[in-house]
Amino acid sequence: MERKKIAFVIYSLESGGAERVITELANNLIFDYDITIITLVKTVPFYELNPRIKLLFCSETIKNDTTLIKSLSDGFKRIKTLVRYIKENRIQLVISFMTSSNIYSIWASKLSRIPCIVSERANHDIYKLPKLLEVIRDVSYKFCKYLVVQTEANKAFYSKKLSSSKILVIPNPIAESLSNKRNHELKTSKNIILNVGSFKKGKAQDLLIRAFSEIENKDWLVFFVGDGPTKQENINLTKKLKIEKKIKFVGKQQDIEKYYNEARLFIFTSEHEGFPNALLEALYFGIPTISTNCKHGPADLIRDKENGFLIPVGNQNVLQKKMSQLMNDIVLQNKFSENAMKSTAKYKITSIVKLWENYITKLI
């Protein structure tokens, strides 16, 4: 029997959360379906792709033209290219990630008379679209079969625009590269507090630095994994507070599992998120965790006082109290660790693929 044919559409396959998820979905679905990935712009895939996956692109580059007429003209060209690829490859279902790709994919699918699933990944409290693009998005999304979002908060946002029956909550999976790398035997004698994430506005790593400087910490170290534009100012802050010997900035790491396995605590300080992948990974590794209750994601992952602590965004006093409590309570650490590992079982890639397949099989 001929296998069903699915095309994934996304802007590029460079490094990023949406790009990783599409890659992992495609790599897992290739065993049951013929998979094509179409990118709007030509890029070298950052994540490893199964060689059986066909890779196509709409154009070599995309210019950010300011004129409305040129932008619309380029948009119609991309839709035309997508229609051609759909017909040439006899695609039966399109799955698209990110707003611009979603809009093009919906209209290309409609012209090709096949179903389309789209997925939004952004936090819409933070990333505002231009008004015209917002209107085009809202009109276009009425013609998709399903809209996939990562959190209940995002579902609530889109429920004002679409029927709730069309909106599916499917979170990100735990990165396949981290699966089966959990090893508590790697815990060292050092008491390590870990933070993982880019250094940029909204990540608020300075909150952890300030809180750490105010509590009894003689036996503890803080490791920051990640790079970005605000890294140097955070380094300067540790010097100003005279705790630079206690704080380690190790940059972006390929072997991130080493840091997850060695950490005693994980502190997540973001002011906003689309979906907090690092927080999910920390819970998967069973690290006792404190997280800000920002929009969106932490409240979907953490049950306060069960598998971690949720604290108000930006509240240094509460963070200090919870850190001191957790640092000095081994029983609570063990409780959070055990419950965290249990709570992340549903985020394994096999579980997430099954959620997607439940709806794929309804359409093709």
Annotated model-derived regions:
Residues P288-T292:
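Short hydrophobic beta-strand element within catalytic cores of glycosyltransferases
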Residues R303-K305, F309-Q316, Q325-I330, A345:
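Conserved acidic donor-binding segment of nucleotide-sugar-dependent glycosyltransferases
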